């Protein structure tokens, strides 16, 4: 990221794990066009799940997963976006945030999920006030279908509409005009801190009846470069063809 961005900052912090251990964590903040006061934010989580608790094989449920889709897919798109921003300086300020420890929580316990975004939201500079934020999570599915996430609609309906209008304008049919189930993700702490942020996520990976989420099957062969390109294409249009 340092090869591309105008500035990169590491936000380091610690967390006490469920077994009392101290875990060292790091958020990464990359900024482009530092002089611009009109800014937008894109984010993803760069950690992966330390245990595959949803794996059909009980022997694998205490082992870490690769997280090719759940984690790496959003990061991959943002790394490529950073390269594009380096080659084509944006007309607006852009901040790319890579959050740590999104996936440390246990099922049905939200306390230890989204730790990186919670820390960032609690310690952000008063001057950090992007026009909107877009979170990428699980966007590499070969059967990509991104629906409107209910918490995004609740916190930032105008941003959801803007993104879906842009997707329709450019023929990105993977952005479906229906709602998904609500998701607790890194966009929640950001919205609670006043940063209007929506979550682009395809939780049905690959479908409702068979999910690789939080299992050892979340591997690169289940993901599609085409899906990554579709989401990346949307982001570039939002940056360079602005109307919000």
What are these regions (language model features)?
Residues 132, 141-244:
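Active-site-adjacent substrate-binding region
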Residues 14-17, 34-36, 46-50, 101-105, ...:
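Solvent-exposed loop/turn segments at secondary-structure junctions
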Residues 53-64:
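Glycine/charged-rich beta-loop-alpha catalytic/anionic-binding loops adjacent to active sites
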Residues 62-158, 174, 182, 186:
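Acidic/histidine-rich catalytic neighborhood of metal-dependent amide-processing enzymes
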Residues 9, 29-31, 39-43, 67, ...:
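Structural recognition of the beta-strand scaffold that forms the well-ordered cores
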Residues 1-35:
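A non-catalytic alpha/beta surface segment that caps or lines the substrate-entry region
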Residues 2-6, 80-90, 122-126, 164-169, ...:
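Sec-exported extracytoplasmic/periplasmic mature domains
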Residues 5-18, 89-94, 174-181:
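Surface-exposed patches in mature extracellular/periplasmic domains of secreted proteins
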